[in-house]
Amino acid sequence: MKCCQGPSGYGEFFSEEQARREVRRYRSKGLSKASRWVVDAVRERGVEGRTVLEPGGGIGAVEIELLKAGAARSTVVELSPGYDEAARELAREAGVAERMERRVGDFAGNGTEPADVVVLHRVVCCYPDYERLLGAAVEKARQTVVFTYPPRNVVSRALLGAVNLWLRLRGSEFRTFAHPPERMVEVVRHAGFEPYTHRRGGIWRGIALARDGRGLR
C-alpha cells in the first residue's frame, strides 16, 4: 500500500529498498491488474495531450504507461524521497523522463498546479483525513479523478487492524485506514464530478469520475 499517516511514517516504510523491489517487479511483470485498471479508466475518457497528476505515485509506473499512451506531461507528488532515484531511472529507461516531474511533499498541503487528470492509486487507504485529500484532488482536477481503495468489510478491517497492531508494536508511525467508500465518492461528486466506471472486484476497488458526468457503466 502506497499510503501513510504522515511523512515520517511514509519514508520509513517506503524506502529506497522498497522502491527497488517495485521497480524489479514492474520490469518483470508490468502493471498489476489494479494499476492497469487505473490506466484503462483514464484512457477511456481520452489521454492524448492531457496532463496527469498523481499523489503517492511511487515509482511512477502508472504515469509512465499514461505518458506512453499519449499524455502530454505528468507530475508525481510523493511523500517519500526514497522513491526518487529509482523512479527517475525508470522514467529515463522508458524514454519519458523529460515529460515527468517529481516532487516530494504532502499533496494535500502543497501548491501543485492543476492537471486534467488526478490519480490516487492505493493512497486514500492510509491518509487519515480522506476529505482533505480528496478535496485537494478535486481542486486540482480539471476533468477526471480516479482513485482506488480497499473494500470496507469485516475481512479487510480485521486485516488492516492486524497490520496496524503489528506496525505499532514495531514502533512504526505507518498506519492504514478503511474509509467508507460512499463518503469518499460523495466528496468528489459534491465538486461536480460523476462516476463513469467502477472496479468492483479484487483487493483494490476503484472508481473513476468525470466533470462531464456522462454516466456510470
Language model features with spans:
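Conserved class I S-adenosyl-L-methionine
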Residues: 1-46, 50-58
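Class I SAM-dependent methyltransferase SAM/SAH-binding core
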Residues: 59-99, 104
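A short SAM/SAH-binding and catalytic strip from SAM-dependent methyltransferases
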Residues: 117-129
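A short, conserved alpha-helix within the catalytic core of class I
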Residues: 127-137
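Conserved beta-strand signature within the Rossmann-like core of class I S-adenosyl-L-methionine
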Residues: 142-151
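Short, glycine-/aromatic-enriched active-site segment of Class I SAM-dependent methyltransferases
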Residues: 156-173
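Short alpha-helix
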Residues: 174-192
